Amino acid sequence: MSLTEARFHDLVDATQQNIEDVFDESGLDVDLENSAGVLTVKFEGGSQLIFSRQEPLRQLWLAAKSGGFHFDYDEEESRWACDTSDELLSEMLARMTFEQAGADLDFSEI
């Protein structure tokens, strides 16, 4: 069953807030900007992670130095998974944060 528009927006809002919370609590030197549904994480070295919502597809998109990734929400598992690799958003985000900032953060709750 496809996500309703309202459910999709609630999920993306909660996910983006959880991502912000992890970075805020980490003490890592990053700039966070959330505007018009787009969350941008700017690392000290200038690299960025950009999270945006694609409402027609009901996907959360992530743009990073290593490429662009599209995530579908699995209601049964309560998690976002990449539509091409099945890698979980939490795992990919932890890996990318380590690659870009050298920090080992836990995103398992997103």
Swiss-Prot record:
The record ties this protein, via Gene3D superfamilies, to: Frataxin/CyaY
- Keywords, A to Z? Iron, Metal-binding
Q: Look up the record and report any one GO term of the cellular component aspect.
A: cytosol
- The signal peptide, as residue positions, is none
Please list the GO terms describing molecular function.
Answer: ferric iron binding; ferrous iron binding
- What processes in GO biological process is this protein linked to? iron-sulfur cluster assembly
- Which InterPro entries does this entry report, sorted A to Z? CyaY, Frataxin/CyaY, Frataxin/CyaY_sf, Frataxin_CS
The record's SMART domains line, in alphabetical order, gives:
Frataxin_Cyay
Q: Which PROSITE patterns match?
A: FRATAXIN_1, FRATAXIN_2
Family in the record: Belongs to the frataxin family.
Physiological role: Involved in iron-sulfur (Fe-S) cluster assembly. May act as a regulator of Fe-S biogenesis.
Protein name from the UniProt record: Iron-sulfur cluster assembly protein CyaY
- Look up and give the organism this protein is from: Pseudomonas syringae pv. tomato (strain ATCC BAA-871 / DC3000)
